[in-house]
Amino acid sequence: MKKVIVTGGLGFIGSNLIKILLKKKYFVINIDKVSYSSNFYNVKKFSNNRNYKFFKIDINNDKKILKIFKKYKPNAIFNLAAETHVDRSIDGPESFIKNNILGAFKLLQAFRKFVERYKNSLLIHISTDEVYGDVLTGRSKEEDAYKPSSPYAASKASSDHL
């Protein structure tokens, strides 16, 4: 059975990804630090599923993250863990820098150590369209220049470049 880790799995997108992965018969490990945007209701339907495990861990804790990687040996890791509210980022950018930049860095460092031994795993980092700034016409493309207009967008752009 393939194993997948989802960080930020108590959020809206993360919990829906977990739902899809469980339907496809993956073993899913949900890692979430549990913050203002976490919602246990999102995972209530599958919290007793034998192919689902939840761990309350901050991605800044690279030692615990690496321990989980080594224990479960995931085929893939989806990083959806992030502070996500634009207005909150303006009022207090520090947690966005800590979680979205440093947290992504710590997760990447743990992943680098993990893949030294387990080479067949991949990490998929999830971003946001906010990194492109205000798109007035049409849609943004991946090749477009970054123009973040909030601390949230800047923190996600920074993590993309790691």
Named regions from a protein language model:
Residues M1-L162:
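N-terminal Rossmann-like NAD(P)+-binding domain of SDR-like oxidoreductases, especially those catalyzing
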